[in-house]
Swiss-Prot record:
Gene Ontology annotations for the cellular component aspect, listed alphabetically: Golgi cisterna membrane
Record bears the keyword Transmembrane: yes
Gene from which the chain derives: svh-11
Keyword Electron transport attached: no
Protein name per Swiss-Prot or TrEMBL: Putative galactoside 2-alpha-L-fucosyltransferase svh-11
Amino acid sequence: MRLFHFLKFLTINNFSRYCLKIVKVHIIWITIICIIYFNWRFKKLDFMAIPYPPAVIKFNTSAKYLSSNLASSSQLGNNIFEIASLYGLSKHLNRTPLFFIENGYHKKMLDNLRKTMPRLMEKFRILNGSVPRSISETKFQRACCLHKSPWSLEKNRDEYLHLSGKYYQSWKYFPNMRNELIEFLNPTSIQIFGNLPISDDQNHVTCVHSRRGDFVEYLFYASDPKFMKNAVTFLNENEKVGSRNRKIVLFGDDLNFLETYFSDAVLSTDVGKNAEYYISQNPPIDDFLYSKNNCDVVLITAPRSTFGWWIGYFSKGNKVYYLDIKYTGDHIFESGGLIASDFYPSHWTPLKFASANSFTVVRS
């Protein structure tokens, strides 16, 4: 009898456990469905931004480290600025740079940077997880595009120095490091640029970068076809190339825009076709490598474009022209968030329209 009751108890208990598991499974699926629905309906939940658990770190080591908040959801040009600046700051402060993989965007950023500048990322210690609460945050870098002296950081003796800023878009954070950063570009990438011309004794290559896309959406100054065309005329008149053929290579995020205003241009995929104007359809890393090897002169037509900035910085000729941001009505510049001498290297040349009633381009 006792055995019977015991077996009955086990049967009921097992059934209860089974029912509980069924309920839990249904709750989990209902929760997942609700999350997906609300994400689709209200577009507010971003799975990529969900924080990872805190990284495991050790204290009382013999090293000192430097890390920062990162605009990891931004595009490649912004990402390179942040990493190059942190590397430059870490060298100045004699610290080891850290990269915390805080969420899905950080993971994507890391993957893209490893493809583009693997040797630079080898300089960083990579930690899988968010910044632990045991690391305090140090205020630094209040705006995107200006330089703040690191002298205040020199006094900090914390083992882990974590900065509050983002973007770090100033060449002054990595001065005199151009050759080193160029060498960090991925050397294993197959340097086949399609139909794009090669800079040599026969050809002089001018590289023109444009940016439309989200610049139009967010009311940043996007590339203006009138400025692009007239600035190219300015360069043709002022850049002496001797007997070499002039070749113009266009880079940009809006193929329709480029084909509309440069209808005679051929694509980099149009193998065998010869022309004066070409449009690159290559991946970003190939565009950087092409610039390193072939861009004698660079024209940046969207002055806030960080990708265009790096095309100029990595360029073979290290001779860069850009639309003077003072004449674009850029709200970041006008609010003091961008200082031109911090953002643009001093040997780069600003251009502008000659007057409000003229499309002739002149030096600013």
